[in-house]
UniProtKB/Swiss-Prot annotation:
Protein name: DnaJ homolog subfamily C member 3 homolog
Signal peptide: 1-25
Organism the protein comes from: Dictyostelium discoideum (Social amoeba)
Glycosylation sites: N51
Pfam family, one: TPR_19
Location relative to the cell: Secreted; Endoplasmic reticulum lumen
Broad class of the protein's primary localization: secreted
Claim: Glycoprotein is one of the keywords in the record: yes
Listed PANTHER family: DNAJ HOMOLOG SUBFAMILY C MEMBER 7, DNAJ PROTEIN P58IPK HOMOLOG
First and last residues of every TPR repeat: 29-62, 69-102, 103-136, 184-217, 218-251, 264-297, 302-335, 336-369
Domain of life: Eukaryota
InterPro entries linked: DnaJ_domain, DnaJ_domain_CS, J_dom_sf, TPR-like_helical_dom_sf, TPR_rpt
Length: 502
């Protein structure tokens, strides 16, 4: 009898201890829940997640606990906010298993399934919601939106991968993203479109978002590396590309990009060296190889187009030189060197007003640059020279004509255009032509006058004089040691202009 009393007392003590533990556990769960909610309101999600997890651990396998579903739902929300969608789905699956009629958990699960590209599963989930709550407007709206997203995705994949229509694709992708914000495929297509449009900052933003939730995303690491290289950050680019190869050693994109970077650097260095060696055609070949890799990078492409401009002018291709400078200025409209060298190309093409305009624009960015000031002076002088009578053109001879060739040309033209051979109606015009022929001959037959004329002096202007440096226009070297080149004739009467590079 005494033994039975002892057992009874022991059982009572155990029951009391258990009740006390349950009360303590309940209080602790409530405290973890309350503290977790407070931390969420302060934006401290990691700490909140710890509190929710502690509460869930205390509940254990008691799926009927009144806070069980709520805690799982809240922790799933944090996982989703952190981009940890698989963990979020795991918690939501447990919550729905405990309470199949929980609409909020089902809507959240459908949203995450959509973000993972599991559209069919998401549609089924929304349909289950409608079976529970036929009037649920959110489920109805999302079903229609997902149908549209599926159509848009099919269309935009073709636009990006086949048509290469990056500009128009961006609007569609952003529209899709407004419905399924975390869909990785959409973010990666946006990376490609933003990169091709030159919006490097947005590429970095998209890749950062992907890597926060999936640090091993090789595709995101590839686009991040490719973008940093285009921004001129080679070392950072190589770091991300090599990191991608750690996760996938056989990844063709990362391997190809590393090879491309090395090829680009080699072509760029070769182009510069060949230019310095005055091997301009060979330099142009290397420039084209480099531009094929990086045609639109403000950092890499601008100096290449500038070097191309100089090479083309060296081989007397003025119009193509202007086009190359135009491309440099499209990438960097404030580039004073590009403006200066385009002005030099305009000088070669005898478009002195455009040359003067570019020199003046360059001066706005570099007001104290002596080369730019000299360019302005040369363009103004060339404009003055262009207004003079072109004696060489009048006689139909080259600037290099000998005295004998000058005399021969004069005699031939004088006989052909003598006023006595003209009719009365054309006599006045014929006399003017004859006078011009005589004036040209008088200027060019005299060695001293011819020299003064070739130097840019108006020999018929009694107040003319030298007026500065004349047509020789200096001879200083340009940027990176590039020297001006000589002897390009500016029409019949131009004086052997020198062009200067920066």
């Amino acid at each position: 009898m005494i033994v039975n009393k002892k057992y009874f007392l022991l059982i009572c003590i155990i029951i009391l201890i258990s009740i006390n533990c349950l009360v303590l556990a309940k209080d602790e769960i409530e405290n973890f829940l309350k503290e977790g909610d407070d931390l969420v309101s302060k934006g401290k999600y990691d700490l909140a997640n710890e509190n929710y997890s502690n509460a869930i651990d205390l509940i254990g396998s008691d799926t009927q606990h009144p806070q069980y579903v709520s805690l799982l739902f809240k922790r799933a929300g944090i996982y989703h906010q952190k981009g940890k969608n698989i963990l979020a789905l795991s918690d939501l699956n447990r919550a729905i298993e405990a309470n199949p009629d929980n609409i909020h958990a089902r809507l959240k699960r459908a949203k995450i399934q959509s973000s993972l590209g599991r559209f069919e599963e998401a549609m089924d989930e929304y349909k289950r919601v409608l079976k529970i709550r036929p009037d649920n407007s959110q489920a109805k709206q999302q079903i229609e939106k997902l149908k549209k997203v599926e159509q848009q995705l099919e269309k935009v994949r073709d636009m990006v991968k086949v048509e290469k229509n990056y500009k128009d694709s961006i609007a569609i992708l952003l529209d899709i993203q407004s419905v399924v914000s975390d869909l990785k495929e959409v973010r990666l297509m946006l990376c490609e479109c933003f990169f091709q449009q030159g919006d490097h900052r947005k590429v970095l933003d998209e890749t950062m978002t992907i890597l926060k939730s999936e640090p091993s995303s090789v595709a995101a690491l590839y686009w991040r590396g490719k973008t940093f290289f285009s921004m001129g950050e080679k070392e950072i680019a190589m770091k991300f590309l090599k990191e991608g190869l750690k996760f996938d050693p056989d990844n063709t994109n990362c391997r190809a990009m590393i090879k491309t970077i090395n090829k680009f650097e080699k072509s760029t260095a070769n182009a510069q060296e060949l230019f310095n060696q005055q091997k301009y055609q060979d330099a142009l070949g290397q420039i084209e190889d480099a531009l094929e890799i990086e045609p639109n990078s403000p950092t890499h492409s601008t100096p290449l187009y500038l070097l191309k401009c100089k090479c083309l002018l060296k081989v007397k291709k003025g119009k193509e030189s202007i086009e190359a400078c135009n491309r440099a200025l499209e990438l960097d409209e404030l580039n004073a060197d590009a403006l200066y060298n385009r002005a030099e190309a305009y000088m070669y093409e005898e478009d002195y007003q455009k040359a003067l305009n570019d020199y003046n624009k360059a001066r706005e960015h570099k007001p104290n640059d002596p080369q730019i000031h000299d360019g302005i002076r040369r363009a103004q002088k060339a404009q003055q020279m262009a207004k003079r009578k072109d004696y060489y053109k009048i006689l139909g001879i080259q600037k290099s004509a000998t005295p004998e060739e000058i005399k021969k040309a004069f005699k031939k033209l004088a006989i052909k255009n003598h006023p006595d051979k003209s009719t009365e109606t054309d006599k006045e015009k014929a006399q003017q032509i004859y006078m011009d022929i005589n004036e040209a001959y008088e200027a060019l037959k005299d060695e001293e006058k011819r020299k003064r004329y070739d130097m840019g002096e108006d020999i018929n202007d009694p107040h003319g004089g030298q007026g500065g440096q004349g047509g020789g226009f200096g001879g200083f070297g340009g940027f990176h040691g590039f020297q001006g080149f000589q002897g390009f004739q500016q029409g019949g009467g131009g004086g052997g202009f020198q062009f200067h590079f920066r």
